[in-house]
Amino acid sequence: MPLTALESTINAAFDARDTVTAATQGEIRQAVEDALDLLDQGKVRVAQRDASGAWTVNQWLKKAVLLSFRLNDMGVIAGGPGGANWWDKVPSKFEGWGENRFREAGFRAVPGAIVRRSAFIAKNAVLMPSFVNLGAYVDESTMVDTWATVGSCAQIGKRVHISGGAGIGGVLEPLQAGPVIIEDDCFIGARSEVAEGVIVRKGAVLAMGVFLGASTKIVDRETGEVFVGEVPEYAVLVPGTLPGKPMKNGAPGPATACAVIVKRVDERTRSKTSINELLRD
């Protein structure tokens, strides 16, 4: 089915989603399956960047993922530790894969790595024991380290390092919300969290424990400029606080969390300098 027909069918089905059930067959089921297969192969993605740097979200693909939950019944998923099973609606990306299929895909998935069907993993990526949710896109030569999470529909660029325990938030609902986007050559420090549609631009570095949501203030300590929802290219961020407003009795109010841009580097410096050196004040 051509992409335009897929999009139209899925949009119409989503508008009438209350009528879509596990018993639904025919064109709607086929359209959703086709869309999930295209996502799984990386032939389409939930969001893509244009030449100007703007990201466009393909909402119809998010709708396809949401419709799949209505179309698919719960079932036993084998492969748990100690012979245990799971009970879910979404199969593993690796279901039925053998040596040839893994070699063709060209990425590394160590024991304990969980990837749900419709997520795409590009060549030379490395997945340590981690979780990649449905509809996500992980580009070439990216490392998803131990206990890191890539949320539903998140977009991860090339040569990104997502450190141990870091969380990249997912988004399926509300439908109008955009996914978290980590552009090429970024470093996300251990136990950091990027959520609520934040965009981390090319080459940025987040120190350990940086938390970014849609309303988190990102303060450039040199210029005083404040960013919200987007980390500038090649910015180096550490956790910080902003002074709170005085309370009614005149006492200092509680400080609020923010992220602080401690420096900015160019592409050449970023490529030649270790992360530890960049984060050293």
From Swiss-Prot:
It comes from the Bacteria. It is an enzyme of class 2 (transferase). Its main location: cytoplasm. Its EC number is 2.3.1.117. Pathway: Amino-acid biosynthesis; L-lysine biosynthesis via DAP pathway; LL-2,6-diaminopimelate from (S)-tetrahydrodipicolinate (succinylase route): step 1/3. It is found in: Cytoplasm. Substrate binds at residues 108, 145. It catalyses: (S)-2,3,4,5-tetrahydrodipicolinate + succinyl-CoA + H2O = (S)-2-succinylamino-6-oxoheptanedioate + CoA. It holds the Pfam family THDPS_N_2. Keywords: Acyltransferase, Amino-acid biosynthesis, Cytoplasm, Diaminopimelate biosynthesis, Lysine biosynthesis, Repeat, Transferase. GO terms for cellular component: cytoplasm. GO terms for molecular function: 2,3,4,5-tetrahydropyridine-2,6-dicarboxylate N-succinyltransferase activity; nucleotidyltransferase activity. One of its GO terms (biological process) is lysine biosynthetic process via diaminopimelate. InterPro entries: DapD_Trfase_Hexpep_rpt_fam, Hexapep, THP_succinylTrfase_dom1, THP_succinylTrfase_N_sf, Trimer_LpxA-like_sf. NCBIfam families: dapD (TIGR00965), PRK11830.1 (NF008808). Homotrimer. HAMAP family: DapD (MF_00811). Belongs to the transferase hexapeptide repeat family. This is 2,3,4,5-tetrahydropyridine-2,6-dicarboxylate N-succinyltransferase. The lineage of its organism: Bacteria, Pseudomonadati, Pseudomonadota, Alphaproteobacteria, Hyphomicrobiales.
